[in-house]
């Protein structure tokens, strides 16, 4: 997407902001539904802590790598769009799949299943979110306009994810 020197239309800001919903809603929902793992599946606090901690460690490592990849991509679709698309698909499929847990599989199996799929989910989130946020900053070359774009996107993402939960 080429940087614009003029004001970005409000409709563009709002539609861009809807993408922020995915970045806010899925991790928030993951935290809320984590209670199911503790109460219904008997995950102890150490397991619960590892499920929260380890995927975020992987996320912290992969975010800068994804930024480098996205910044240095040259394709007919641009630097960002294909990653946003692929990341959204990975996030959606993984989020649905990770909750397919059954008590009869056993505690250890369910723990590893959920942990591995949580890591895959956060990889999808990285593939989606890093180029997505960069795309928002590339929509305008003007500082205040970029600030407005991201403020609207954050507002939409935060409020709609709260309504969802």
Regions found by a protein language model. Name each.
Residues 2-163:
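Membrane-embedded alpha-helical bundles of multi-pass transporters/translocases
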């Amino acid at each position: 997407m080429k940087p614009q020197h003029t004001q970005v239309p409000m409709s563009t800001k709002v539609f861009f902001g809807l993408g922020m919903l995915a970045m806010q809603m899925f991790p928030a929902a993951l935290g809320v539904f984590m209670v199911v793992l503790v109460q219904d599946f008997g995950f102890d606090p150490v397991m619960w802590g590892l499920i929260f901690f380890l995927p975020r460690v992987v996320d912290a490592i992969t975010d800068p790598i994804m930024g480098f990849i996205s910044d240095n991509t040259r394709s007919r679709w641009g630097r960002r769009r294909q990653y946003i698309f692929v990341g959204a698909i990975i996030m959606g499929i993984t989020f649905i799949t990770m909750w397919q847990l059954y008590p009869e599989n056993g505690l250890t199996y369910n723990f590893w299943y959920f942990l591995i799929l949580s890591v895959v989910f956060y990889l999808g989130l990285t593939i989606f979110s890093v180029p997505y946020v960069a795309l928002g900053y590339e929509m305008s070359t003007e500082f205040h306009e970029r600030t407005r774009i991201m403020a609207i996107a954050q507002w939409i993402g935060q409020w709609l994810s709260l309504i969802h939960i």
